[in-house]
A protein has these predicted regions:
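Juxtamembrane/interfacial segments flanking transmembrane helices
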Residues: 43, 168, 207-220
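PDZ/PDZ-like domain segments forming the peptide/carboxylate-binding groove
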Residues: 30, 34-69, 73-76, 130, ...
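Juxtamembrane boundary at the C-terminal end of a transmembrane helix
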Residues: 252-257
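Functional transmembrane alpha-helices
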Residues: 3-12, 110-203, 218-241
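Terminal peptide-recognition signature
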Residues: 21, 56, 64-67, 71, ...
Length: 257
C-alpha cells in the first residue's frame, strides 16, 4: 500500500482523521453560537420572575434562584429546563436549585397551557444583554453541551419507544421546511438552526454503528488494542449492512415526512 494512503496509517492516526469531521462540526457550532450570543445576548438559568398562581410559585421558587438540575440531569442552559419539563408529559419533576450558595430540591407538577401547546411551570429567566466575548464563548460551550445532551435524550426516547415517530421524528423534508421557516424569520435564526443541525449530525455520526464514523472508530480501537488488523471482509460486510439499514431508515423517515 501507498505509505500516504489512509489504510497505511496507524490506528491512532486513522482514528484522529475519522473523528476530525465531528470535531469540526462542534467547532462550527461554537463559532456560530458565540457570534449570536455576543450580538443578541442570551438567557441564563437564574430566575427573573415567577408568575403568581403557577406551579413554580406554589413550589416556593423565588427570583434569583438558579436552576442546576432537572430530574437529576445537569442543566447547561435554560432550554434544558423547558425540554425537561415537556419531556415528562405533565408528570412531576424534581428541580434542584441554588439560592444564596445553598442547594435545595423541589418537586413540581407542570401545567399544560392550551394556548402554548406545551407544559410550563411559570418562570421567566434573567437575560445577559451585553455579554463579553469570553462570556459569549462560555455560553456557546454550554449551549453545545445542552444540544449534545438533548440529542442523546432524543435518541434514547426513539429507541425506547417513548418518542412519537409521527410527530417527534423528522427527515430531509422536515429539515428543509425548518430551514425555510428560519430563513423567513431572519438570517440569524437560520444560523442558529445550522448550529443545532451541526451538533446533531456530529453526535449521530459518532454513534458506534457500522458505516458511521463512530463505527469506524470502534473498529480502529479494536485494532489498536489487539494490534491486529480487522479483516477487510468483516469490515466491508459490517459497513454494507449498516449502510443499507441507514438508507432504509432515511427512506422510511422521508416517506413519513
Amino acid at each position: 500500500d501507498d505509505e500516504r494512503s489512509f489504510s497505511a496509517k496507524s490506528p491512532l492516526r486513522r482514528i484522529s482523521i475519522i473523528l476530525a469531521g465531528a470535531f469540526m462540526n462542534f467547532v462550527l457550532a461554537i463559532v456560530i453560537l458565540s457570534t449570536i450570543f455576543n450580538i443578541f445576548g442570551f438567557a441564563t438559568t437564574s430566575l427573573d420572575r415567577i408568575e403568581a398562581g403557577t406551579p413554580a410559585a406554589s413550589a416556593g421558587l423565588m427570583p434569583g434562584d438558579r436552576i442546576t438540575r432537572v430530574n437529576g440531569s445537569k442543566v447547561f442552559t435554560n432550554s434544558d429546563i423547558s425540554v425537561g419539563v415537556n419531556m415528562n408529559k405533565g408528570k412531576k419533576i424534581d428541580l434542584e436549585y441554588e439560592r444564596g450558595g445553598l442547594k435545595d430540591t423541589v418537586t413540581i407538577e407542570p401545567a399544560y397551557i392550551e394556548d402554548e401547546g406545551r407544559y410550563m411551570i411559570g418562570v421567566y429567566f434573567k437575560g445577559e444583554e451585553n455579554p463579553s466575548i469570553l462570556s459569549s464563548i462560555k455560553e456557546s460551550f454550554n449551549e453545545t453541551a445542552s444540544l449534545i445532551s438533548q440529542t442523546f435524550k432524543g435518541l434514547k426516547m426513539i429507541f425506547t419507544g417513548e418518542a412519537n415517530l409521527k410527530t417527534d421524528v423528522g427527515g430531509p423534508v422536515t429539515i428543509i421546511k425548518m430551514s425555510a421557516g428560519a430563513a423567513e424569520v431572519g438570517v440569524w435564526n437560520l444560523m442558529k438552526l445550522v448550529a443545532i443541525l451541526s451538533v446533531s449530525i456530529a453526535v449521530f455520526n459518532l454513534l458506534p454503528f457500522p458505516a458511521l464514523d463512530g463505527g469506524w472508530a470502534v473498529i480502529l480501537f479494536i485494532e489498536l488494542i489487539t494490534r491486529r488488523k480487522v479483516p477487510d471482509k468483516i469490515v466491508g460486510a459490517l459497513n454494507t449492512v449498516g449502510f443499507m439499514l441507514l438508507i432504509g431508515v432515511m427512506i422510511l423517515v422521508t416517506i413519513k415526512d
